Amino acid sequence: MKRIRLLILLSVLAVALPVGLLSGAAKATGSSGTSVSISQTADFNAFGTQLDVNLLVRCTGGIGLANVTVNQPHPETGFPATTGDGFNPDVVCDGRTHSVGVTILGAVYDPGRAYAIVDVTAPSGPAHIEKWITVKVN
């Protein structure tokens, strides 16, 4: 029993320490001019098991791709942690900031904190951001 507790504690620390260092990040800009930010909240539809994450993306050169991964560790959700990902292949890259929705299907999230990781690939270059968000059930 002590070994299990120790393994759980070490797992949480392994995730929490590096995540804690990055939790203040709210906006990321690639060196080439692509930028992305994550909405503070994500909406979870409990009946459809889908999580909707909203982004603000600015890029140039045509069409880009946004990929989102959301991890919800224990104790926010049951053990083991919940992880899901989704993408939007139709990000408009015209130099203006656009709202971009990404839906994650098939993962069951609980209300509370979760960690979002976003990568945008665009003709104007990549952008990356990581941030703690709040999952709300509607």
Q: Which residues does each PLM region occupy?
A:
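Ser/Thr-rich low-complexity repeats and stalk/linker segments
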Residues: 62-124, 133-137
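Short, surface-exposed binding/anchoring microloops in extracellular/periplasmic proteins
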Residues: 33-76
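A broadly tuned, weak detector of single residues within folded domains
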Residues: 6-8, 21, 48, 111
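Bacterial N-terminal signal peptides that target proteins for export
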Residues: 1-11
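Bacterial N-terminal signal peptides
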Residues: 10-20
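C-terminal region of N-terminal signal peptides and the immediate post-cleavage residues
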Residues: 19-37
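Short beta-strand segments
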Residues: 34, 127-133
